[in-house]
Amino acid sequence: MWGTEDWTVSAVPGSESEVANGPWEGMKLPELVSKYPVEILGRKVAEAYGNQLPLLTKIIDAQKDLSIQVHPNDEMAQREHGKSGKSEMWYILQADQGAHLYAGFKQAISPYEYQNRVEDGSITEVLADHQVQAGDVFYLPAGRVHAICGGIRLAEVQQSSDVTYRIFDYNRPAWMESPASSIPS
């Protein structure tokens, strides 16, 4: 097993969080936010996003290296999927000694080199490799290639979106979607 991913606060359709107790017990989070947008989101966020919760939070516990992936920006995600794009932030809760993650490229690469490295499995050779420890924080704007590697438990705060393009999965059975156009040149 690769690990676990718990969606702790979600308004993503089909994966909505539910109030556990109190007067709104059993109510789905989007319904609650719709009834009390200013009280839950604050005035500025409610004005910017209406009755929509703009964030999704997760706890990810990676036992093995997770797939290398990228997320589209708002414009591409809206055009291709009718959804928001996805920028995210990781807060490292726990990291085994020597644990690392990938975030971005070491240097600029051409679309041709990118495609060849994905196909021949050498894409990790050009990714920026970051050693991590508890307390580290990483911001991953939409379009930044990234992967959580084994031995890391983190909290993820991201835009409320489930659009992910998997680039490379270490030759495990997987699929390649259309990530190349998400990566800024």
Question: Which positions does each model-derived feature cover?
Answer:
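Conserved metal-binding segment of the jelly-roll/cupin
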Residues: I68-H71, V132-G150, Q159
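Active-site glycine-rich loop that binds ribose-phosphate moieties when present
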Residues: I109-Y139
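Transition-metal
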Residues: M1-I109, D169-S185
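Flexible, active-site-adjacent loop/turn segments at secondary-structure boundaries
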Residues: E31, K58, Y112, G121-E125, ...
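A short hydrophobic beta-strand segment most commonly corresponding to one strand
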Residues: E88-W90, A147-N171
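Short, well-ordered, mixed-charge alpha-helical segments that flank or form enzyme active sites
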Residues: M76-A77, G98-A103, I109-Y114, P141, ...
